[in-house]
Structure formats: structure tokens, C-alpha cells
């Protein structure tokens, strides 16, 4: 195309590094394909994964496509941890705004940038495409476990915001979009189902298909060696086979692992299987190219009995390279395979079903035929190119700017700071009210908007101007802001509306602009929780506009406030209540894993919450 666009693909991992999973493969192929078709592409890698040095193969591939790989480091302290990657990505994007950002939903990498655009601070001319590989909950289901950290829950709240604030959403499977809608995720429109790019179309190089038609001599468990990928299903299915079918068979476990060893695999297989097979090997450090070479050995049958998948590259690569396989009939996997081949190669992920599939395959002199793709690979490339060339940021006309703001200062230090802030504010007339309490200050306030300033709040010169502008851009009822904690000098970000997470900690904000008609004398946590539960819109600026000397309230340090927040949740019937079962399960799983390390006050508060929820 003429005049390619400036594209930034934001990823957590990329090809060229051992252990890269499906999302990293998809992001890498997309970046290369867009670069090869005339776009100016940067591949931005969020902190958390070392990508140096890249393998020579992928260093060449990126260079040949004119793709710049830019790994980010965590150059500043950011809390909470689940928002840190998005804060670093935001810093990078606003320094050189591209025309289009394609951001992986994994780890909510675009959250801070999208929130900044929503409140009118930056990136107004940048279009955002959310590339949806699956929220934290889907990954947890795939691993056959309940999410067991509060951080994962918070990450999912941020992921929800990303899919709502983007200009387009792309999923590689219809199944995932259906899952999101069934779980009441609000998705930006338009949404697209575009299958992940294949190696052939991304690199523009034809692949040599595997040699097939011979007896199976090598069985390969292909995928990460863990429960969710079905390793125990595979092992149990082998134990159910007629042992004679395993005579002379090589067993290969091909994928990365954190815990499985060859000794453990042999123990799980049992003596009868071990005695029959010719060899048992684990290959856990191969890169993608080397792994595919192993699978293309004559007489190989790949087995992928995962409990849940979105659009697995393991299956797609077998289809592309003509590698015979058996896979689980789950999630979006069937969408990759031609209708007429699905009943041959897809099976429920149980030992009995996979044993029933493996038996005939091992007994056949010709093995099994490879499966064909459901769609022509070129369709995905055409769809991506059309989207990238046409997507634009949604038009968001600004609302009415607040004309008058009352700053209610409850303390001697805060009163002095409020007066200085009033002198520095340019966008609104400021009424400074010095009062002994928030209630007393509200009685005196006449402005449409109020800002409570406590002694532990040290506002920047542009705090009020920033809040007023953000409110006009977003139309929110409450606008809070990130702050700099006095004790560490980093940045403390907030979700604004954290849903059910607001029950256990203040993720709303510690300083904010509120409509006076909605304000009350409650503490920040209680006030913002009640407003969010009542359906009022709360957004939080991702740039620190104040220093804060206190700690955000949470059940462990503010039990009285926690009780008031709990009572607010109990009387609500809003969206946050639908998230409580998942939060409760997450807390239970977290306590089961870490109970000994949890402070006694937190344990008592959590037990109180659980008792109240179970009434």
C-alpha cells in the first residue's frame, strides 16, 4: 500500500525466545506481516520477559520486515503490580504516538494508555485495536484451577476496561467472543473474528509438509507439561491401551515445564507402559522451529488433550505443516479444522476418549491423515490489512467544563495547600472551604463540583486543571487520579471502578473531583464505593497529579471502613455483585495457598466478609 501507517504492536513476549506461547507467536507474526506489507511497525515488549538476545532466525525475520523490536524495562516503581506493565507501555506510547496500537489483552497492556485517552490527556489521534487472546479467567480455566491471587482479579478488571475502551476488538475465535458475552463483558464495536496468522502468510514463505502415510512410531505430547494441557489425560490414556500397541513406540513430551521431570513421567506411566515403549524423552527447551522439526519426523503423531483452548497455535501449526494429530474438542479448537475432519481428530479430553482414538491410530499401517484448515490462511492476512488501514479513533466530543469547584480542606496543612491550589488553577473558579469535617464543608459548598483535600494530600500545581479537563472529556461523575506515595516516590494507580475488588481494598482513588449532588461526608473508600455501586461513573487518571502521605484503605488496615463498604455492597444490586462469586473463590484459593503468611487482621476481616456473603 502507499503511505503505510505507523503501527505499534504491544506484546508480553515474542518469538525468538524459548518458551514463547500462543499470544507471543500471534503478535510476532502480525508485526512481521504488517511490516512486509508496507507499514512502519514497532514491536513493543512490555516489562517482565527478557528478549535479549533474540535467536538469529527471528532477529533476521524482524529485520527483513523492517520491524523494530523495543523491549521495555520497569524504569519506575508502579503499584499495584497488575497495572505496572500498562503504565510502562503508556509511557512509551505517549512519547511517540503511533497511528494504530494493536495491544494484546493479556496483562491489560493498553489499560493506562486507553484510560489516558478517555480522559483527554494523550493519544487522541491513535486508534486502538484490542487483540483478545483470553482474560485471566480463561487462562485459569485452561489450567483447571480457580484464580488464586487478587492481582489476577484486578488484572481482569483492567482487561474488561481495555475491551470496552478500544476502537475495535479482534478475537481469533468465535468461541472466545461468545464466552466474553456470556460473562457480560462489554465489547467495543466493531468486533472481528480473525484467525491467528500462519507462518506461511506472515513470512511469505511456503512450508514443507511433513511426510505422512506410515505407521506411527513416535507419540508426542505437544504443549506445556502441565495439568491444563492434559498431560495426565495423555498418560492415563496410554495406560488404557492394549500394551502391545506400544511396542517399539518412542514417547516424546515436547514443551516447557516448571515441575515435570522424566522420573515423574516414568512413575506416572507405570511399569507396563515403560517396559513396552522404546524410549521416553522430555524436550523442554526447544524453540518453535526446532519443536516443529521434531514433529515432522516420519511416523509422528502429535497429541494435544487440553482442557480448554481459545485458538491454539499447537493445533494450527500441525494443520499448517501437515502433521498428523489428535486434539481436544474444546473452546475454539474446532474452528481451526475443516468440518469433514473434525470427528476424526477431535475428541473429548478424557483418558477413555483419547485411548479410543489412539488405539486405531497405533494399529494402522498408515497412521492417520492430517487435518485440513477450516479457512484459507490468506483470509486472516486480508482481514488484518483491511482493519489496520481503516481503523480510526472514535470521535469523543468534549462535554461541558466545570465552571466552579469547591475545595474542602479538613486540616491546617490542607487549608494552606488548598489556597495555593486555587491560585494556580486556571480552568475553573475555586472556592476554598476550611472546615473541621467533610460534612461541615459540604454544608458551606455552593459549587457544582467538590474536591476533598486532607492533610496527607499534597496536590500538584495542575491537579484541579487536570481533574476538570478529565471530567469534561469523559463525562464521569467522579474523577480520581494516580498519586505519588510519599514514602517511595513511585506511582500508585487506581482502577477507578474496580467492581467487586472494591469490597476488599480502595481501588477507586484517594483524591478526586465529585459532583456536589453526589458527595457525602464518608471517607474516600466508602464514598466512591457507594457511588460506583449506585451506577455512577468513576474514572481515574493514570498520571500522578498529587503526592499522598497515607495508605489506601483496605480490609487489613481500615476494618471500620471495610464494614461500611461491605454494607454498601449488601444493599446494592449492581454489576459488582455478579463478580462476587469469582472474587470469593479467588480469596478462598489465595487463603488456601498463603494463609500462614496473611496477617491476623486481614484473616478476621475476610472471614467476616465470607460469613456475610453466605447469609
Where are the model-predicted features located?
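Boundary detector for helix-to-coil junctions that initiate low-complexity/charged tails
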Residues: 559-615
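Conserved acidic donor-binding segment of nucleotide-sugar-dependent glycosyltransferases
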Residues: 343-352, 361-365
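Nucleotide-activated donor-binding/catalytic signature segment of Leloir-type glycosyltransferases, i.e.
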Residues: 255, 264-294
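Carbohydrate-associated surface elements
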Residues: 175, 197
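Short aromatic/hydrophobic "clamp" motif used to bind/position activated sugar donors
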Residues: 450
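Aromatic "clamp/platform" in nucleotide-sugar-dependent glycosyltransferases that forms part
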Residues: 307
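Conserved donor NDP-sugar-binding/catalytic core segment of glycosyltransferases
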Residues: 462-492
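A conserved mid-protein helix/loop that constitutes part of the nucleotide-sugar donor-binding site
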Residues: 25, 29, 226-240
Amino acid at each position: 500500500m502507499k503511505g503505510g501507517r505507523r503501527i505499534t504492536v504491544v506484546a508480553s513476549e515474542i518469538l525468538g525466545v524459548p518458551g514463547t506461547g500462543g499470544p507471543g507467536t500471534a503478535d510476532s507474526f502480525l508485526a512481521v506481516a504488517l511490516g512486509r506489507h508496507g507499514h512502519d511497525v514497532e514491536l513493543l515488549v512490555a516489562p517482565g520477559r527478557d528478549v535479549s538476545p533474540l535467536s538469529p532466525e527471528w532477529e533476521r525475520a524482524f529485520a527483513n520486515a523492517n520491524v523494530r523490536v523495543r523491549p521495555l524495562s520497569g524504569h519506575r516503581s508502579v503499584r499495584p503490580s497488575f497495572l505496572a506493565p500498562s503504565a510502562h507501555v503508556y509511557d512509551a506510547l505517549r512519547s511517540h504516538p503511533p497511528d494504530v496500537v494493536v495491544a494484546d489483552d493479556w496483562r491489560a497492556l493498553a489499560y493506562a494508555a486507553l484510560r489516558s485517552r478517555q480522559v483527554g490527556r494523550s493519544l487522541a489521534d491513535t486508534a486502538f485495536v484490542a487483540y483478545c487472546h483470553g482474560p485471566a479467567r480463561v487462562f485459569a480455566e485452561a489450567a483447571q484451577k480457580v484464580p488464586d491471587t487478587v492481582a489476577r482479579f484486578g488484572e481482569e478488571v483492567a482487561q474488561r476496561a481495555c475491551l470496552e475502551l478500544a476502537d475495535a476488538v479482534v478475537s481469533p475465535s468465535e468461541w472466545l467472543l461468545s464466552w466474553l458475552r456470556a460473562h457480560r463483558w462489554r465489547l467495543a464495536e466493531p468486533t472481528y473474528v480473525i484467525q491467528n496468522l500462519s507462518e506461511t502468510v506472515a513470512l511469505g514463505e511456503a512450508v514443507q509438509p511433513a511426510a505422512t502415510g506410515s505407521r506411527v512410531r513416535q507419540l508426542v505430547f505437544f504443549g506445556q507439561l502441565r495439568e491444563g494441557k492434559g498431560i495426565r489425560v495423555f498418560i492415563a490414556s496410554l495406560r488404557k491401551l492394549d500394551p502391545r500397541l506400544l511396542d517399539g513406540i518412542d514417547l516424546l513430551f515436547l514443551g516447557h515445564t516448571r515441575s515435570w521431570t522424566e522420573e515423574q513421567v516414568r512413575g506416572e506411566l507405570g511399569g507396563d507402559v515403560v517396559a513396552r515403549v522404546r524410549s521416553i524423552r522430555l524436550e523442554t527447551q526447544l524453540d518453535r522451529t526446532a519443536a516443529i522439526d521434531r514433529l515432522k519426523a516420519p511416523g509422528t503423531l502429535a497429541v494435544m488433550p487440553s482442557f480448554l483452548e481459545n485458538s491454539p497455535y499447537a493445533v494450527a501449526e500441525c494443520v499448517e505443516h501437515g502433521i498428523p494429530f489428535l486434539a481436544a474438542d474444546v473452546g475454539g479448537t474446532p474452528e481451526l479444522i475443516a468440518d469433514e475432519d473434525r470427528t476424526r481428530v477431535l475428541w473429548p479430553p478424557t483418558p477413555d476418549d483419547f485411548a479410543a482414538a489412539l488405539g486405531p491410530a497405533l494399529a494402522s499401517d498408515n497412521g492417520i491423515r492430517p487435518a485440513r484448515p477450516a479457512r484459507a490462511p490468506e483470509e486472516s492476512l486480508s482481514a488484518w490489512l483491511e482493519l489496520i488501514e481503516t481503523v480510526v479513533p472514535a470521535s469523543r466530543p468534549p462535554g461541558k467544563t466545570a465552571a466552579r469547584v469547591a475545595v474542602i480542606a479538613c486540616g491546617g496543612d490542607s487549608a494552606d495547600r488548598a489556597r495555593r491550589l486555587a491560585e494556580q488553577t486556571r480552568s475553573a473558579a475555586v472556592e476554598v472551604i476550611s472546615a473541621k469535617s467533610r460534612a461541615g464543608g459540604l454544608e458551606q459548598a455552593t459549587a457544582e463540583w467538590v474536591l476533598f483535600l486532607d492533610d496527607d494530600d499534597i496536590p500538584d500545581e495542575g491537579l484541579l486543571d487536570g481533574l476538570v479537563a478529565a471530567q469534561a472529556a469523559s463525562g464521569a461523575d467522579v474523577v480520581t487520579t494516580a498519586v505519588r506515595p510519599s514514602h517511595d516516590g513511585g506511582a500508585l494507580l487506581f482502577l477507578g471502578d474496580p467492581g467487586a475488588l472494591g469490597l476488599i481494598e480502595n481501588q477507586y482513588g484517594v483524591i478526586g473531583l465529585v459532583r456536589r449532588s453526589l458527595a457525602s461526608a464518608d471517607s474516600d473508600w466508602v464514598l466512591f464505593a457507594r457511588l460506583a455501586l449506585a451506577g455512577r461513573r468513576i474514572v481515574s487518571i493514570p498520571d500522578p497529579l498529587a503526592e499522598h502521605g497515607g495508605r489506601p484503605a483496605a480490609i487489613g488496615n481500615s476494618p471500620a471502613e471495610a464494614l461500611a463498604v461491605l454494607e454498601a455492597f449488601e444493599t446494592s444490586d449492581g454489576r459488582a455483585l455478579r463478580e462476587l462469586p469469582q472474587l470469593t473463590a479467588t480469596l478462598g484459593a489465595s487463603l488456601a495457598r498463603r494463609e500462614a503468611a496473611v496477617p491476623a487482621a486481614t484473616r478476621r476481616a475476610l472471614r467476616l466478609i465470607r460469613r456475610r456473603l453466605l447469609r
